[in-house]
Amino acid sequence: PQDDKADVETSKILKGLIRNIEDQSNADIAYATGGESQTKIGLGYWRVTTEYVAPDSDDHEIFIRSIPNTFAVYLGKHIMPDGSDAKEGFIIDNMPVDTFKEQYPGKKCAPDEFDELGTEDDYWHTGETVTVIERYWLERRNETLYVLGDGTTMLKSFYDKWPQAAGERPAITKERPTHIEQLRWVKMTGLEVLDQRDLPGKYIPIIEVVGRVT
């Protein structure tokens, strides 16, 4: 019973956090945009991002954002209707050159700089726009899971880095092979990487909106 009460309280806290994220994101816009696209062409999307809370802050908060152009999204192979089992996803943005220069000063955007791409240069640069692609993917890494003497579990990579200040490491009573998946993200043009980082989470943060599947 105590665990049941704890689960209820945890559920209430999580629901409150989700409502807060939805409120500060104006998530209804993202939901409506995805739903409208699904109604018109049978498919829509919205996304989850982490963004700085202010220009002078290093703190991040979670936001729900719309993806107005369904055709700008490619979600990797998946079975679940919401795409939650996909292992990669792409979002394509044909960004006006002036906007690109403002957001990425010093990055290559002149038409002749794309000549080295050969016949593909027209895809990446039209003279008025630069194609910017965001890629999310889950990178799998083999691991070993330790069961410790106190009953807790710990990955070998963390166990090996046990800090001396924490005292003696607990004894290992059992181990088994396992794996972890790291969510990675990169934003790039056809010439260079604009930004990249590892992200928290175990899902591709692109949510697919579909109608009835038969």
State where each predicted segment sits.
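Extended alpha-helical, oligomerization-prone segments that build pores/tubes and scaffolds
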Residues: 1-214
